[in-house]
Amino acid sequence: MKNFLQQINSYIKEAFNAGKYLYNGFSVTFDHLRRRPVTVQYPYEKLIPSERYRGRIHYEFDKCIACEVCVRVCPINLPVVDWVMNKETKKKELRNYSIDFGVCIFCGNCVEYCPTNCLSMTEEYELATFDRHNLNFDNVALGRLPTNVTTDPSVKPLRELAYLPKGVMDPHEVPSSDTRVGKLPEEVYDWMRSESNEKKDKASNPNN
């Protein structure tokens, strides 16, 4: 009889734990059902990276002094700095600079410790290629400025997702005339400009 009661007690505990696990799992599922989608229809839509996004490195050849600080602070000694010593000026003369983005971990140490700020992180993340050797960028390729997602006319940024009407989850086919939760960046800019103009008018005409 005692063994039977123990089996019943164990069965009840297992059933209770199973129900608890199911509740926890479904609570996460239902919680995500109320959230907005985070996926986009790439490449027709692109997410706008944050201001501190660490994308492809931009390099300015004219500012570089070939100090090789970027090489020393890089965890994998990635940047290749090709220079020669100028005997007349007794200074380093930079010949070539390259970074292999197939190996780069985008930690940003080279950008942070560069004494002349010749390196900077961009918002470019489209580095996919069929040949890994194409990811080895020289100083010419590094010097090209990437296409800004916010000004790229060939794509539709998902910026409006944060300004959808209340209760709308799908950003597609939303009429522009619908009342939105917040103002679009262009509307905020126009409002700030109008406020600035009004202040200037009041300052120029204090009697009005």
From Swiss-Prot:
InterPro entries listed in its UniProt record: 4Fe4S_Fe-S-bd, 4Fe4S_Fe_S_CS, NADH_quinone_OxRdtase_chainI, NDHI
SUPFAM superfamilies linked to this entry: 4Fe-4S ferredoxins
Substrates-to-products reaction catalysed: a plastoquinone + NADH + (n+1) H(+)(in) = a plastoquinol + NAD(+) + n H(+)(out); a plastoquinone + NADPH + (n+1) H(+)(in) = a plastoquinol + NADP(+) + n H(+)(out)
Annotated signal peptide: none
Record EC number: 7.1.1.-
Major location (coarse): membrane
4Fe-4S ferredoxin-type domain sequence ranges: 55-84, 95-124
Residues given in the record as [4Fe-4S] cluster 1 binding sites: C64, C67, C70, C114
Topological type in the membrane: Peripheral membrane protein
PROSITE patterns listed in its UniProt record: 4FE4S_FER_1 (PS00198), 4FE4S_FER_2 (PS51379)
GO biological process annotation, one example: photosynthesis, light reaction
Cofactor note: Binds 2 [4Fe-4S] clusters per subunit.
Gene Ontology cellular-component annotations: plasma membrane-derived thylakoid membrane
Keywords attached to this entry: 4Fe-4S, Iron, Iron-sulfur, Membrane, Metal-binding, NAD, NADP, Plastoquinone, Quinone, Repeat, Thylakoid, Translocase
Keyword Chloroplast: no
Co-factor requirement: [4Fe-4S] cluster
MF terms in GO: 4 iron, 4 sulfur cluster binding; iron ion binding; NADH dehydrogenase (ubiquinone) activity; quinone binding
Localization annotation: Cellular thylakoid membrane
Superkingdom in the source lineage: Bacteria
Oligomer and partners: NDH-1 is composed of at least 11 different subunits.
Family from the record: Belongs to the complex I 23 kDa subunit family.
HAMAP family assigned: NDH1_NuoI
Biological function: NDH-1 shuttles electrons from an unknown electron donor, via FMN and iron-sulfur (Fe-S) centers, to quinones in the respiratory and/or the photosynthetic chain. The immediate electron acceptor for the enzyme in this species is believed to be plastoquinone. Couples the redox reaction to proton translocation, and thus conserves the redox energy in a proton gradient.
The protein's name: NAD(P)H-quinone oxidoreductase subunit I
Organism: Prochlorococcus marinus (strain MIT 9301)
Lineage: Bacteria, Bacillati, Cyanobacteriota, Cyanophyceae, Synechococcales
